[in-house]
């Protein structure tokens, strides 16, 4: 009887040990799985709009961004363009494919390639930049470009959003382009090339996924870039009334 009791006790303790080991292994596996980087994706069309200028120019404009990856590494496709509805031609068409990694709590570094394919000469650029949230809640995107022709330039985009109510948001934008060398073939002069400023009032209609807006945009060219535009019969400064929508997937 004593022997039987001993065997039962040993079997019971062994079963507890096996159960505990299995449970511990499951906990380790679950913890390891939870530590794996979470892969996410998304599409944001920041600007999808119709513009009408003070000299009767009509444009269809978009600024879209799609991403796939983790917090440690994202792959981004960025597309921007302006299409003249009267001329039925692209005034600008830009696509970027970049990889992005965090370098601080508020900023990411990115590198990749940019393709410009408007109606005129095409250009390919190497891209190096940073993007993130600056003090006072300014969203900043700064990039350095080196073209396949050897020209270098830099671009700064900044945006500030003022929450008027839970649904009404006023957005102010600024973008500026500086060229460190001339590219006459595409109308780019050395120095400050152009600036664009915008003010848009939007309403978050559908759970912040669809937000129609109205606004005004001002664009201006400077220096040799303005001279090149005038020589081609184009303008150097425009004011646009804007209507469009911000769409997020």
Locations of the language-model features?
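Repeated loop/turn-to-beta-strand initiation elements of outer-membrane beta-barrel proteins
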Residues: 71-77, 105-109, 136-140, 165-170, ...
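Outer-membrane beta-barrel initiation region
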Residues: 22-86, 100-101
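Outer-membrane beta-barrel translocator domains and adjoining extracellular loop/strand segments
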Residues: 56-57, 88-93, 122-127, 154-157, ...
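Outer-membrane beta-barrel "beta-signal"
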Residues: 199-205, 235-249
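Detector for outer-membrane/organellar transmembrane beta-barrel domains
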Residues: 122-183
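Residues that define the transmembrane beta-barrel architecture of outer-membrane proteins
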Residues: 39, 58-62, 91-95, 122-126, ...
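Residue-level signature of outer-membrane beta-barrel architecture
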Residues: 68-70, 99-101, 115, 132, ...
């Amino acid at each position: 009887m004593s022997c039987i009791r001993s065997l039962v006790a040993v079997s019971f303790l062994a079963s507890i040990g096996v159960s505990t080991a299995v449970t511990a292994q499951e906990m380790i596996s679950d913890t390891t799985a939870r530590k794996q980087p979470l892969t996410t994706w998304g599409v944001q069309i920041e600007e999808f709009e119709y513009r009408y200028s003070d000299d009767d120019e009509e444009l269809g404009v978009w600024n879209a961004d799609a991403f796939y990856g983790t917090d440690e590494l994202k792959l981004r496709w960025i597309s921007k363009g302006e299409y003249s509805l009267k001329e039925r031609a692209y005034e600008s068409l830009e696509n970027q494919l970049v990889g992005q990694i965090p370098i601080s709590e508020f900023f990411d570094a990115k590198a990749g390639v940019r393709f410009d394919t408007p109606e005129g000469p095409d250009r390919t650029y190497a891209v190096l930049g940073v993007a993130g949230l600056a003090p006072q809640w300014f969203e900043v995107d700064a990039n350095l470009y080196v073209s396949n022709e050897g020209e270098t330039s830099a671009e700064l985009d900044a945006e500030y959003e003022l929450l008027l109510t839970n649904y009404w948001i006023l957005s102010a934008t600024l973008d500026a382009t500086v060229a460190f060398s001339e590219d006459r073939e595409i109308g780019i002069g050395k120095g400050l090339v152009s600036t664009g400023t915008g003010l848009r009032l939007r309403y978050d209609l559908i759970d912040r996924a669809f937000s129609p807006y109205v606004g005004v945009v001002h664009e201006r060219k400077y220096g040799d870039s303005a001279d090149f535009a005038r020589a081609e019969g184009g303008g150097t400064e425009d004011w646009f009334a804007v209507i469009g929508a911000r769409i997020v997937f």
